[in-house]
Regions:
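Phosphate/nucleotide-binding catalytic core
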Residues: 71, 76-80, 90, 120-124, ...
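N-terminal regions that are enriched for targeting/export leaders
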Residues: 1-22
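Conserved small/polar residues in nucleotide/adenosyl-binding loops
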Residues: 137-139
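Active-site acidic/histidine clusters and adjacent loop/turn architecture
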Residues: 44-77, 87-92
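Surface-exposed short loop/turn segments
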Residues: 107-134
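Charged, often glycine-rich, active-site loop that binds/positions anionic groups
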Residues: 79-99, 116-117
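Acidic/histidine-rich, surface-exposed loop or edge segments in extracytoplasmic proteins
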Residues: 25-44
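Short mixed-charge
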Residues: 99-109
Length: 139
């Protein structure tokens, strides 16, 4: 069990908002480009309001001090996208090991799962134990 599964979830009520144009991000979104099932392309680049506020502050600081800026690679993602990316990563790892796999027996390959879970959280639909990136307001 991952450490975040032991931490009680307390939603702070902060809403998801669109990332403002003062912040730069990839367009199209890298996962959308791979075929990830975003239902609405206009809702891809969203974060909790407090996260946006902090990123704007850091970005302003970087620009003022060094003429650098943040380039956002990823943001909130729905569970369907998490599942798509997890399965994609799993398939790629299986291909590297020359393993033919179906997702019905995904747990039969713990060594592959371990590699994938270094970068991707398992796409759990359990509201008591969601993946760590997920905003519960959208479960």
């Amino acid at each position: 069990m991952k450490i975040w599964n032991k931490i009680p979830i307390k939603d702070n009520g902060d809403k998801l908002i669109a990332i403002p144009s003062c912040l730069k991000f990839f367009d199209p979104h890298p996962y959308f480009h791979l075929g990830a099932p975003y239902k609405d392309k206009t809702s891809i680049w969203k974060l909790r309001k407090e996260v946006v506020n902090r990123l704007v502050k850091v970005n302003d600081y970087l620009i003022s001090k060094n003429s650098f800026y943040l380039l956002i690679y990823d943001s909130w993602r729905p569970l369907e996208v998490q599942e798509f990316m997890f399965k994609r990563a799993f398939l790629l790892e299986c291909e590297k090991s020359d393993i033919d796999i179906s997702f019905e027996n995904i747990k039969s390959y713990p060594s592959i799962l371990k590699k994938v879970e270094k970068f991707w959280a398992y796409p759990s639909y359990d509201t008591k134990c969601p993946p760590p990136h997920l905003s519960l307001i959208h479960i």
